[in-house]
Structure formats: structure tokens, C-alpha cells
Amino acid sequence: DSIWIGSDRNIQTLNNLQRLLGSGRLANTGYVSILPVDQDIEHTAGASFAPNPIYFDPENIVRLAIEGGCNGVASTFGILGSIARKYAHKIPFVVKLNHNELLTYPNSYNQIMFGSVKEAWDMGAAAVGATIYFGSEESRRQLVEVSEAFEYAHELGMATILWCYLRNSEFKKDGVDYHAAADLTGQANHLGVT
């Protein structure tokens, strides 16, 4: 309680944060385990699920999260939307709003919106999530889009999760890849919480 009392978030947002923190095996421990499954869009379903074909069925993804004792499950509109009526009240949903797709060549590291905050709210999601590729040509647009989406999510009472990644070909110099450098990733995370 001492963490949330001073928050400027509305009561419904705090309620949904508590839904996430108070679910699963780690309930109310201060730790969170959310099963993230958006690889089917980011890396193709075949590459992601071929070793375990039962996960082509969205229901099995949610069952895995529940049986694994996760606090929540984060996935796409398609996966969560197809089973929302059966599971949204059993485990907190985090709907991923934007995605990159690998069919465009060359890959542009461009996260685009696949649905709306209102659609996620209507399917019973406790939270929405989004990715920003800091350093990419599209990162400024992504910042504006995600910021506006998260503002609306908070108005509706949803929690928000931001995934911060670095994507810039200039971060590779003389055979060294600096995408995982502490100063660069730290700056991306700092920008993400600002």
C-alpha cells in the first residue's frame, strides 16, 4: 500500500495493478511473472511454435500461464481476443498494442499499432503493453503513439507496460554490437519511464 498511496493514477488503474500483483504463485510477494507470447507476429508463428505445436492454439497459451502460476499473460489482440470470454476473469490479460512484422524487406524496426486501447479494455484486459525501438528512425512517432495510448489506458483504469529496446544499425561498430551496452540500454529505460 505504501507504494501506491502517493500515486497519481486513478483507483481503477491501481485496482488493475493489484490484479496483476495479486495473482498467480507470486501473488503479493513484490515479484511479477508475466508470460509474454507475441512471438507469432514478431518472429512468425511457425518459427515460434513449431517445436511445440499445441501453442498454435491460443487457449493452450493461456492455460500454460495459469498452470505455471503466472501473474498474467501478455499477448496479441488475436490470441487474447479469441479466448477472452473464457479466460479474462481467470488471469489478468496484458494486450500488446503494437508489433513489428518481419515480412517487410528490409526490416525497418517499425512498431505499428494493431488495435486500440478501447478494444483491449472491452476484452477485459487489466493492462496494455507496447514496445518502443529507441534509436530507430520511427522511435519519435512510436513515443507519441504509445504515450497517447497509455494516457487513454490510464483514463480507463488500465495498467501499462512498456518494453524498451534499442534498434539502430549505427550501434554496431567495428564488429562490436552495442545494443546491449549498459549506458545505451539504461538510457532507453530512462526514456521509457519518463
Predicted regions and their residues:
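Alpha/beta enzyme core
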Residues: 27, 32-34, 39-194
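N-terminal basic, low-complexity leaders that serve as flexible interaction/assembly modules and, when applicable
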Residues: 1-37
